[in-house]
């Protein structure tokens, strides 16, 4: 909606004969009941560990996460946990209670990942502009994370999908 608003503003500025009937005056929207919606996970791959070895990286993660090595790949099973692919091994990272905030935005798994892994450990301050991180839609599955980690990425994080209720808060 914000980008549509910017387009509208730019178009009206450049058209002195604006009459409010142009197509850029309209924004298509649709409404669905929240209980009929599903949000898929939105995963991340990172190209390097910011100079850390795998062992150093895992050691830093242990400050804020309980870590369990998995025998097989799997998606996270609940909020406040991620699955991580590092060095051909899958891990489950579960956030320790001390980092789970009451604030509805800071409680989101994406915020926990950003504030406790990406920014402080991997030095990714702005994931929208940093060239070292990429986003992988959940529809592409864990196989895509494995493919990326065998080609151009060092570590991958699979996130539990945010609920509609959390999104609306």
Where are these regions (language model features)?
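Surface-exposed, charge/polar-rich loops and edge strands
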Residues: 2-169
């Amino acid at each position: 909606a914000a980008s549509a608003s910017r387009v509208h503003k730019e178009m009206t500025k450049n058209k002195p004969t604006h009459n409010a009937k142009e197509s850029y005056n309209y924004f298509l929207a649709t409404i669905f009941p929240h209980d009929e919606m599903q949000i898929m996970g939105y995963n991340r791959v990172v190209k390097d560990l910011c100079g850390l070895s795998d062992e150093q990286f895992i050691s830093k993660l242990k400050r804020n996460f309980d870590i369990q090595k998995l025998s097989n790949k799997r998606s996270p099973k609940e909020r406040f946990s991620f699955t991580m692919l590092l060095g051909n091994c899958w891990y489950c990272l579960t956030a320790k209670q001390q980092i789970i905030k009451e604030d509805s935005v800071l409680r989101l798994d994406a915020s926990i990942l950003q504030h406790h892994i990406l920014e402080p450990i991997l030095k990714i301050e702005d994931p929208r502009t940093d060239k070292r991180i990429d986003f992988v839609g959940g529809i592409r599955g864990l196989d895509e994370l494995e493919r990326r980690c065998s080609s151009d990425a060092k570590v991958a994080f699979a996130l539990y999908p945010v609920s509609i209720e959390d999104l609306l808060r």
